[in-house]
């Protein structure tokens, strides 16, 4: 947390220098005030608080936890002022650990946004609906630590923004090897990553190959279950294709084809590619589910919108313009063919041809029908283009508050991941993060601070014998971790409290 507060103080100082005439409360916050208010935002999801207004109606132990209670008006103002100083940019480096690793996993997460305003739309995967929303691109390292986040409108496909996004990740972390799902499976992106000197590990679609025969492959490994792993390139060389392939042929089931650029071959053994790719599920997809459950990842923050050109209409207009241009060429071609054939019919008529005249008239009839068809199609496209009218406007979300709160969520997830890794080293009984959060944050308790220690009492009323035993083991583990609060040793005790 000290790193976060230091980053915020630097952002405040920088803003004050750049805008010496501006004056609002955040610019004058003491370190303690800044620390407590950010802590309130940080711990809110663990207390079951997703939207800030829930601070006004939900009973929560914030006063016990950080020594100060807050309502939504105060925290809403605080968040608005963090937005004003562009705190998201300042907080982003706090996500990156000292040793970020050598592999970055990137995935997008769609969040629905309900509004009556005309906004750009995309497919919100978890709801299966086309609607307004936002797309968070989140990067994790190989141990599941979140590294970077950036928001985009939902109508922009991942492939359109991924190169610029990865450039920012490289600048922030120094990692140049990326593992991304089939949303970026294309030769163009493989070439783009290869030109940058980056590694990209992805999968080939099933319709892009005809099985093992499509590849000049060499057997590199055979698993105990009969699965064979091959490595190679296309059977028919494609000199413009920089991809190398790893093919997994299970004893039963379909072929799986992974591909990577030269950087991937330099950094990873080809036999390890399938396992590295499969770890996406736990590192990212399951992480998103956890952050939805206890990190408020799906909660929208901020109502500001930015008006701009209607990209849906713009794309439709561009498609119609291309189709209309092609239709005009077809009309001109058919018109020329009809004119040429009419001249032949006139020639046959003047020369008194019999059978040839019938043939040419029959051909002319077919050409005239084809001309009418292409002219009709052209008229339809022209009418559709005219119906679109002048280019309109649609709104996009202002993502500044959303980004700040998502960085908060990622910081929380990183802290919980590190905390669990340490705690499990002191426990003989395995426990999941969800179970631990339920035991500690969904039960009442008390906090006692003396001159020499801080004691947290957890209410055990209503716990079954097995869960009481588990909570006791967790309490012992927490005490063994030698945690400290403001320099004082922290102890966790269990106590049955009256209802």
Annotate each PLM feature.
Residues 334-385:
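Extended alpha-helical coiled-coil "stalk/arm" regions
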Residues 179-188, 206-209:
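Acidic, metal-coordinating catalytic cores used for nucleic-acid/nucleotide bond scission
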Residues 151, 195-287, 292, 452-453, ...:
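An anionic, glycine-rich sequence signature occurring as long contiguous blocks
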Residues 1-130, 136-153, 159-164, 171, ...:
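Dynamic "connector" segments at or just before major functional cores
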Residues 115-117, 186-193, 211-215:
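A short acidic (Asp/Glu
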Residues 288-349:
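Charged, amphipathic alpha-helical linkers/stalks
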Residues 22-29, 263, 269-278, 299-308, ...:
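Short, solvent-exposed helix-loop connector elements
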Residues 169-177:
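Short, surface-exposed connector motifs at secondary-structure boundaries
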């Amino acid at each position: 947390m000290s790193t976060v507060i230091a980053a915020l103080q630097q952002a405040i100082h920088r803003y004050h220098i750049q805008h010496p005439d501006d004056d609002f409360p955040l610019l004058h916050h003491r370190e303690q005030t800044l620390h407590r208010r950010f802590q309130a935002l940080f711990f809110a999801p663990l207390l079951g608080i997703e939207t800030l207004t829930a601070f006004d109606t939900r009973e929560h132990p914030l006063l016990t936890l950080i020594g100060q209670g807050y309502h939504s008006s105060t925290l809403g103002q605080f968040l608005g002022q963090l937005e004003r100083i562009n705190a998201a940019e300042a907080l982003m480096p706090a996500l990156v650990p000292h040793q970020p690793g050598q592999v970055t996993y990137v995935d997008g997460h769609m969040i629905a946004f309900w509004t009556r305003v005309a906004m750009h739309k995309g497919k919100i995967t978890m709801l299966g609906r086309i609607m307004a929303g936002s797309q968070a691109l989140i990067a994790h390292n190989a141990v599941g630590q979140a590294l970077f986040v950036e928001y985009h409108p939902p109508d922009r496909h991942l492939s359109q923004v991924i190169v610029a996004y990865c450039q920012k990740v490289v600048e922030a972390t120094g990692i140049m090897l990326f593992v991304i799902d089939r949303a970026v499976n294309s030769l163009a992106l493989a070439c783009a990553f290869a030109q940058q000197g980056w590694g990209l590990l992805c999968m080939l679609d099933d319709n892009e190959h005809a099985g093992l025969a499509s590849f000049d492959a060499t057997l590199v490994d055979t698993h105990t279950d009969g699965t064979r792993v091959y490595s190679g390139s296309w059977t028919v060389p494609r000199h413009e294709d920089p991809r190398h392939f790893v093919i997994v042929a299970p004893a039963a089931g379909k072929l799986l084809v992974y591909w990577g650029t030269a950087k991937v071959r330099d950094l990873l053994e080809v036999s390890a590619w399938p396992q590295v790719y499969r770890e996406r599920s736990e590192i990212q997809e399951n992480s998103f589910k956890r952050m939805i459950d206890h990190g408020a990842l799906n909660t929208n923050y901020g109502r500001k919108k930015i008006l701009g050109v209607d990209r849906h209409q713009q794309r439709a207009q561009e498609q119609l313009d291309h189709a209309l241009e092609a239709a005009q060429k077809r009309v001109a071609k058919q018109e020329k063919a009809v004119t040429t054939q009419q001249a032949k019919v006139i020639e046959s008529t003047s020369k008194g041809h019999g059978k040839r005249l019938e043939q040419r008239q029959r051909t002319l009839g077919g050409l005239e029908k084809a001309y009418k068809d292409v002219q009709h199609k052209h008229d339809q496209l022209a009418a559709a283009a005219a119906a679109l009218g002048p280019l309109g406007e649609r709104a996009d979300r202002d993502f500044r508050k959303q980004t700040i709160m998502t960085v908060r969520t990622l910081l929380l997830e990183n802290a919980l991941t590190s905390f669990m890794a340490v705690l499990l080293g002191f426990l003989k009984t395995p426990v999941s993060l969800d179970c631990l959060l339920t035991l500690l944050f969904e039960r009442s308790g008390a906090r006692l601070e003396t001159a020499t220690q801080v004691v947290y009492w957890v209410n055990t009323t209503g716990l079954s014998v097995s869960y009481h035993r588990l909570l006791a083991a967790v309490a012992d583990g927490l005490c063994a971790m030698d945690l400290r609060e403001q320099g004082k040793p922290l102890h966790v005790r269990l106590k049955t409290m009256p209802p």
